[in-house]
Swiss-Prot record:
<keyword id="KW-0969">Cilium</keyword>
<keyword id="KW-0132">Cell division</keyword>
<keyword id="KW-0282">Flagellum</keyword>
<keyword id="KW-0206">Cytoskeleton</keyword>
<feature type="region of interest" description="G1 motif">
    <location>
        <begin position="73"/>
        <end position="80"/>
    </location>
</feature>
<feature type="binding site">
    <location>
        <begin position="73"/>
        <end position="80"/>
    </location>
    <ligand>
        <name>GTP</name>
    </ligand>
</feature>
<keyword id="KW-0131">Cell cycle</keyword>
<comment type="subunit">
    <text>Septins polymerize into heterooligomeric protein complexes that form filaments, and can associate with cellular membranes, actin filaments and microtubules. GTPase activity is required for filament formation. Interacts with ADGB.</text>
</comment>
<feature type="binding site">
    <location>
        <position position="128"/>
    </location>
    <ligand>
        <name>GTP</name>
    </ligand>
</feature>
<dbReference type="InterPro" id="IPR027417">
    <property type="entry name" value="P-loop_NTPase"/>
</dbReference>
<dbReference type="Pfam" id="PF00735">
    <property type="entry name" value="Septin"/>
</dbReference>
<feature type="region of interest" description="G4 motif">
    <location>
        <begin position="208"/>
        <end position="211"/>
    </location>
</feature>
<keyword id="KW-0342">GTP-binding</keyword>
<feature type="region of interest" description="G3 motif">
    <location>
        <begin position="125"/>
        <end position="128"/>
    </location>
</feature>
<keyword id="KW-0966">Cell projection</keyword>
<keyword id="KW-0547">Nucleotide-binding</keyword>
<dbReference type="InterPro" id="IPR016491">
    <property type="entry name" value="Septin"/>
</dbReference>
Length: 467
């Protein structure tokens, strides 16, 4: 198929739903045109706007397309192999460890070209999914990643100077959910994860490594899986049936869900030709043989038939739901309390008035809180001041008492010094009188005189030491 024909085919699919809806409601449209005073006219000659589809095709081919796939499944279940087989390309994805402490999402973008149609393909792999002992929150990193891509697109959309034409749209268009071929039922982790993802992304469940289960068990397993999904309220992607050209095929494919797939890039010789297959001792499982697996059906509905619908559903359903919830959280609404239309300016003014009132209320609360805290601080400071004053008075009283004690001791010491001085003077007078009285006798007795002089010298030294 030529590139222009591929683009026309994609655009034709994207617009057929609108066309069919318009044809089915033609009567109501006529009444609406009458109410709006719109007239239908027939032109007398060729004008040229019939080339609008061709213009759209040419511009789309020039711009290129993007498609983002999220692969969710346990490590080693065959996610990378299936993607390689789907796009007939070796994306060189490295093997992941089974010992990751947390679930991480790894995104890789590739540029592919078929004829002259360019496709920017992003593959997001869930590294470490299902490898933890506690798997209760394993789905949360996936939900956060999808919401982050929606938020990035919303922020770009809300910019004053936005450039959506050159913006790399990283929103997830489809989630291929890989189910282990146990043959029994869905794991609790699978149900919990798909339940939290069904409102955010288009989910297509696939049974991985379907060649490990017999055909009879596989058919029973499919019925069991769909029954569990329905009973638990999990909404998986349904291929659209409103386009007459593909309605029959998509209706049949909806009855084949979940697809049982086998992936392989190895080629095995079967008969006179080489085919992609998996070689076993008991035989060969051909990837593109519909009697062996549903790989061809998956590739047909995912890439050839419904790729544009997946892109459109992502934008019109899942992104719009996220956008609406975000704007409602911000206070924006389409109708007022009386169910009257509300313009963006009115909503802005209402929110501005609300924020102004909230700001004034917060300022008043902060002022009151500040005054209260100042009063509390002043009370604490006054109490501390009283305690310091009491301590000061106590220390002052102790100082005065100590000073009075020292003063009394000083007076007693002075009295003792005066008394000692009097005793010393009396002793000196006594010694002088004794010396004069015995002076004449000492002259007569030289030895006695020498003894008396030594005696008085010793007594004088003793008195000096006492002073």
């Amino acid at each position: 198929m030529a590139s222009s024909e591929v683009a026309r085919h994609l655009l034709f699919q994207s617009h057929m739903a609108t066309k069919t809806t318009c044809m089915s409601s033609q009567g109501s449209d006529d009444e609406q045109r009458k109410r709006e005073n719109i007239r239908s006219l027939t032109m007398s000659d060729h004008v040229g706007f019939e080339s609008l589809p061709d213009q759209l095709v040419n511009r789309s081919i020039q711009q290129g397309f993007c498609f983002n796939i999220l692969c969710v499944g346990e490590t080693g279940i065959g996610k990378s192999t299936l993607i390689d087989t789907l796009f007939n390309t070796n994306f060189e994805d490295y093997e992941s460890s089974h010992f990751c402490p947390n679930v991480k999402l790894k995104a890789q973008t590739y540029e592919l070209q078929e004829s002259n149609v360019q496709l920017k393909l992003t593959i997001v792999n869930t590294v470490g999914f299902g490898d933890q002992i506690n798997k209760e929150e394993s789905y949360q990193p996936i939900v956060d990643y999808i919401d982050a891509q929606f938020e990035a697109y919303l922020q770009e959309e809300l910019k004053i100077k936005r450039s959506l034409f050159t913006y790399h749209d990283s929103r997830i268009h489809v989630c291929l959910y890989f189910i282990s071929p146990t043959g029994h039922s869905l794991k609790t982790l699978d149900l919990l994860t798909m339940k939290n993802l069904d409102s955010k992304v288009n989910i297509i469940p696939v049974i991985a490594k379907a060649d490990t289960v017999s055909k009879t068990e596989l058919q029973k397993f499919k019925i069991k899986l769909m029954s569990e999904l329905v009973s638990n309220g999990v909404q998986i992607y349904q291929f659209p049936t409103d386009d007459d050209t593909i309605a029959k095929v998509n209706a049949a494919m909806n009855g084949q869900l979940p697809f049982a797939v086998v992936g392989s890039m190895d080629e095995v010789k079967v008969g006179n030709k080489m085919v992609k297959a998996r070689q076993y001792p008991w035989g060969v499982v051909q990837v593109e043989n519909e009697n062996h697996c549903d790989f061809v059906k998956l590739r047909e509905v995912l890439i050839c038939t419904n790729m544009e619908d997946l892109r459109e559903q992502t934008h019109t359903r899942h992104y719009e739901l996220y956008r609406r919830c975000k704007l409602e959280e911000m206070g924006f609404t389409d109708v007022g309390p009386e169910n009257k239309p509300v313009s963006l300016q009115e909503t802005y003014e209402a929110k501005r008035h609300e924020f102004h009132g909230e700001r004034q209320r917060k300022e008043e609360e902060m002022k009151q809180m500040f005054v209260q805290r100042v009063k509390e601080k002043e009370a604490i400071l006054k109490e501390a001041e009283r305690e310091l004053q009491a301590k000061f008075e106590h220390l002052k009283r102790l100082h005065q008492e100590e000073r009075m004690k020292l003063e009394e001791k000083r007076k007693l010491l002075e009295e003792e010094i005066i008394a000692f001085s009097k005793k010393k003077a009396t002793s000196e007078i006594f010694h002088s009188q004794s010396f004069l009285a015995t002076g004449s006798n000492l002259r007569k007795q030289p030895q006695l005189l020498i003894f008396m002089e030594k005696y008085f010298q010793v007594q004088g030294q003793y008195v000096s030491q006492s002073e």
